[in-house]
């Protein structure tokens, strides 16, 4: 494993989802069914998320309640994170356990960026 990745993973071992665990894989699931990518997205840690993606993080892996990293980025209004995830192939149509996709999560969020995120999601065309 690359040194940069190891250093970042070490930091996430102190997160309550992974407390007491050694994280050996970017797709390792923590106590609440989330991965380090989910946590990085929730914390708006753009650099950490990028490193995880560059090292094989599964971008559309469902975590707690069926939320994907893109769902969290939309919920918390993190525009740059939404862009990063979409640019790296995240599927905006995946639904969580409540039947919500990224657009509906953005619409229902309390984020001041929700209109921009909805527009971004609606205008995004997946690369072929």
Spell out what each predicted region is.
Residues 28-29, 61-62, 93-95:
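Ankyrin repeat boundary signal
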Residues 60-76:
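Charged, surface-exposed interaction regions in soluble eukaryotic proteins
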């Amino acid at each position: 494993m690359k040194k940069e990745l190891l250093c970042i993973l070490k930091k996430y071992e102190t997160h309550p989802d992974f407390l007491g665990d050694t994280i050996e894989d970017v797709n390792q699931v923590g106590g609440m069914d989330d991965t380090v990518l989910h946590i990085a997205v929730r914390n708006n840690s753009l650099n950490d998320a990028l490193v995880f993606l560059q090292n094989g993080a599964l971008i559309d892996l469902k975590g707690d309640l069926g939320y994907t990293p893109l769902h969290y980025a939309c919920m918390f209004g993190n525009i740059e994170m939404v862009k990063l995830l979409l640019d790296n192939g995240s599927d905006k149509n995946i639904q969580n356990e409540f039947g919500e996709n990224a657009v509906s999560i953005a619409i229902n969020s309390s984020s001041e960026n929700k209109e921009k995120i909805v527009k971004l999601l609606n205008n995004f065309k997946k690369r072929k």
